[in-house]
């Protein structure tokens, strides 16, 4: 498996929420993405991670999001791409699918 992520730093919280909602609606779990999650590291910052079966699928996904990423940059957000093989992916045996998919 392969992980592809972007750490976005926005100019404000409203921009963060708007872009995050847009990306969820238009790109999450599409174009070969198997799983997605977000890490909200600050009021105006989020790390969006997508999990793919392989690097080729992740790279193709990146091509689909290129225009949106450019528009996000044009609005003044700073973005850092994070990507690499996903290893040591462990899940406890007592974790349920409901726990993994619940919104907090």
Per-segment meaning from a language model:
Residues 1-49, 53-104:
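Short S/T/G/P-rich N-terminal loop/turn motif that feeds into the first structured element of a domain
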């Amino acid at each position: 498996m392969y992980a592809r992520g972007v750490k976005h730093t926005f100019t404000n919280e409203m921009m963060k929420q708007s872009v995050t909602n847009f990306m969820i609606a238009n790109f999450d779990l599409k174009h070969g993405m198997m799983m997605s999650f977000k890490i909200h590291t600050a009021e105006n910052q989020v790390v969006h991670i997508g999990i793919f079966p392989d690097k080729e699928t992740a790279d193709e996904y990146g091509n689909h999001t290129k225009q949106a990423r450019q528009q996000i940059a044009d609005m003044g957000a700073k973005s850092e791409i994070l990507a690499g093989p996903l290893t040591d992916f462990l899940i406890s045996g007592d974790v349920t699918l409901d726990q993994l998919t619940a919104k907090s």
